[in-house]
């Protein structure tokens, strides 16, 4: 299970913060629950935001972050999916990741492979999550 608060930058208007809970269904599938929040840390969640979160998990009062990192994301939108290119800054290293996020059902794996082949890149099955990579980074 993982919690994230993502800051979405809007140069022309006020930035927004989105709280995401990632809860596993099985070894492959995760449910993702999202909502806008006013807080940029878990400790700053207001009672309404905490109540929303408590619908899905029990949130201990003394919860502490396991890791912190920053990701700059560029998004190329299409009718079927978003191609997301991430540059993530961990405490001890940076990494890069391309994600293909579905907007609607289609043969996304083939489409993603076509996009990657245009730049001589190859698809590899899912790498460890950013949370797992952040935890490994703390061991460096």
Per-region residue spans from a language model:
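Short alpha-helix boundary/capping segments
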Residues: 37-40, 100-104
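Charged surface patches that recognize polyanionic ligands
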Residues: 1-78, 118
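Extended serine/threonine-enriched, polar tracts that run as long, contiguous segments within proteins
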Residues: 75-92, 101, 111
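Acidic/polar low-complexity flexible segments
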Residues: 103-104, 108-140
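Intrinsically disordered, low-complexity acidic/polar segments
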Residues: 12, 28, 94, 107-109
